[in-house]
Amino acid sequence: MFLKTCCSGSCTGISFVDSTPIRVCKNKRIKANKVFKGTAEIGKSTMGWFYGFKLHLIINDRGEILNFLISQGNMDDREPLKKESFLKKIFGKLFGDKGYISKQLFEILFIDGIHLVTGIRNKMKNSLMSMNDKIMLRKRSVIETVNDELKNICQIEHSRHRSFINFIVNILAGLAAYSFFPKKPSIKYQTVKTNQLYAF
């Protein structure tokens, strides 16, 4: 409760969403792992298969965490965006990678005042996109930098947990520690006033 009320940032109208795997053990030790039996699941990320959980994050353009959700490793990245509690402070543009592509999800969020902006897959038809949105999509790497700092500086991922509660406390402590960083990854941008649309 303290983390979500006192340590979270405020939405600026430009937000980024992403998920990152939280591995609880090496793949070769999955069958031997007893601590997370029945809770952790096998999932797949851009880096391959893993056993553990996912940390879903929404940040603003200043690198401040707006909300987070911990799920099992096999959860679809789009599922948290269907939860009203996960998006209750979010408005404006929400930028995500291709894993968030969903026409139905886009329409649901649009009704709630959130414009979900994603890239397109290779075999999809080109879609019209404003130059501003195209530029902001290229700056989406800021949330990947946040994930990197959470893992490498705040140490939210390691394989030495002796209980599930210890695992959760470690993640929450890491997120709280990050919120007090004096300098966070952020983006600089200028709004381009144009009515032109670009094929993406």
Where are the language model's segments positioned?
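Short alpha-helical elements
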Residues: 1-200
